[in-house]
Each structure stands twice: as structure tokens, then as C-alpha cells.
Amino acid sequence: MCGGLVYPEVPLSSSTAPQAQAPHSSQDSLVAAGGWPFLITAFIGRLPAATVQLGLLLYVSGAGLGLGLAGITVAAVGLGSAVGAPLVGRLVDHFGPLPVVIAATVIQLLSLTAMLAAVVNDGPTALILACAALIGSANPQVGAIARAHWSGLARRRRQPRLITRALGYETACDETSFILGPVIAGLLVGLLGPNPALLTIMAWVIVGQGAFIMYLARHRTEHGAATVEDTAAGGIGKISIAKALPPMMVCLCVGTVFGSTQTALTAVNVLRGTEAYTGVIYGFMGAGSAVASILVSRLPERFPLSLRVAIGASIIGLTCLGLVTLPSTPVIAGLFVIIGVGVGTMLVSSFGRGERIAPSHRIASVMTMLTTCLVLGVSLGAALGGVLSVQPERGFMLTMAAAVVGILASFALHITKPGRLATHQE
């Protein structure tokens, strides 16, 4: 998690896709292609993961263990997710999403239970952090699974424009979940207290991810493991590292923007005594990103992905020139909306390139690789931003540096533009 993509890269021929269906109308909607059950459950299924991370931060600090340990706990969740995401992707490609999502949900619930027991019984810090890492590694990666499903649909239906709209929609869903998840976590801990809140979050995991599991169980034939035909259609099945690195770098830059702006914004509000506004203002970035994700998917095909990334990164860099002056709170909120537009543009473009370079039976693997880079970027941005934000404006300078690297990555995207290898032609 974490759209506007053009999908030229050579349409599937009968030799490369023996199972391809006849082309459908390019105007088919996402609802017609995916169905309401998939759209609803895939959105609900990613909300628990967005709730858990901040929920654990508030839980550990609210339980009296200190904000320092709470921050390290969240870092352990992020590290676990970064390590576990590629493995989850490979397992999904090999076994299909249903058994993987079930196993991940069970591991998450057991780890949350162990963390609750460790905190209540004054367990060692190492145990708490180990539980946090397991919780992160067992993230079922619903967003990546959803993107892989859309890619499969687009390839089977020979509908390049379907994936461009779908990736924009999926990024908007991710951003919406990033807004709603922290709100849900904050309300639960604030209204119920630490221990009841964690129990409620566990129930939320069961309901949210359980809904997606029920959908997968009822549509097993549509969401199975990679078939022999998939492997044949995907060629030798190897992911080109040279072509994968540029979109991975873009995701790393976007994650750094997320992490650095969060720490810099927190530092600004602490300095001004307006800490309560931090989450609200940060949500403006998510709103801008969600809107941009949808709009970018409507851009005409003459705008290549590399140009879109360059424009998105430039928007972020130029906006940071205003942020380093530390303007008033309303102005910062407006600037965060603009940064969100740049972020959304970069995200949908990077995931779009990732989809294009992925063999048919390795799509989930590529999507989770990009998710891993996004998570690592958030951790990098938060860590470096925390050091630099002793003077708040310096945190936004890190954001500006990430934007510059994003512009460089756009050149790499252009140089490594896929040839006649997949379903489209850029």
C-alpha cells in the first residue's frame, strides 16, 4: 500500500498467453471487473495493519513503559514487516493468498496475545520487542495481494487501462487506511485504556482480515497459486534487478518523505505546544495523496511513468522550500496537502512500473518488495529526521533531499524502461 499508469508494453499474443480471454471493453469499471465483495473486503482487510502500529505505540506508552520503549516497539514492528513482506509475497505466489493470509493472521493474534501477557506480567523488554517484530513480519500484505489480483485480471482480460485505474484506486485505499488506522487506534486507547484497547484491536484483526479471508475462501479459483500457464506466460520467471531497482528507489524515497515529515512536523508542534494537531495535519498529506492517486490514473498515455515520478518529486521538493520557513499551522496543513499530491503521483507510478516488470507468477513478490522499500524508507526518514529535527526546519531538509533522489530515480526509470517483455509497452 503505498494508478495513473500508461500501459503500453506489448499486448499479450496467443503464444505468450494461451489462456487469455477475449479483450473486454476498456471502459469496464473497477466494480465490474473486481466486484463489490473484493473491493470492500480488500479495503477492510488492510485497516487492521494500519491500526496495529500506532495502537502498539499508544499501548506500550499508555501501559506505563515509557515513550522510548514505545518508539522502539514500533520500530521493531516496521523492521519485522520489512523482513517478512518479501517472504509473504513469495509464499502468496507459490501457495495462493488464502493459506498465507490465514497463517499470517493466526501468527499476528498469537503475537498480540503474547505481548499483552508480557506487558501485564512485567515481562522482559526483549520479549516485548520480539512480539512486536513477529506482529510486523506477519502482516498479511493485503494491499500487495490486491494489486497482484488486479494485475492478473488486467493480463487475462488484456485490458491495460484496467491496471492503471486499479493501482490508483489501491494507493487511494492505502492512504485512506493510513488516515483511519491511527484514528481508530487513538480512539480505542483513549476511550478504553491500554489493555481493553489491545483486546479490541485483536478483535479488529479478526473481523477485518477475517472478512478478506472469507472472500478468498469463496473465490478460491480466482485467487489460487501460480499455474504452469502463468509460469509459461511469465517467461523464465526471473525478476530483472536492473529494472526493479528504480521503482524500489522511488518507494524508498517516498517512505523517507513519510518518515521525515512525520518527525519534523512533530518537532514543530512540540515547539509550539500544538501537539494535538500533529495527526490531523499529517492526515492532510494522506488526503492529498489519495486524491492524486485517482487523478493521475486519468492522465493520457503520452505522459510516461518516469515523467510522472519526476513531477511528483519536484512538487515535494519545491513545497519543502515553504516548509523550512516554518509557517503558521494552517499554511503547513495546506503545504502537506501539496506534498501528498507529489507522494501519490510517485507511489502509483512506482507500483505501476513494478507491475510491468513482474513475471505473471511473481507479481505478489514484486509488490511486496516495493512495500518493503516503502517501510524501510519510513524507518530511515524517521530515524534521520529524529536526529535532524532538534532544529525542526532541518527535518524538512531531509524531505527535500529525498525528493532530489526521487528525481534522479526518475531518470533511472526512463533508462530502464521495459521493452517488449510483458503485457504493455511504455
What residues fall within each predicted segment?
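Intracellular juxtamembrane helix-capping segments at the cytosolic ends
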Residues: P140-R155, L265, T345-A358
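A late C-terminal transmembrane helix in Major Facilitator Superfamily
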Residues: H361-P392
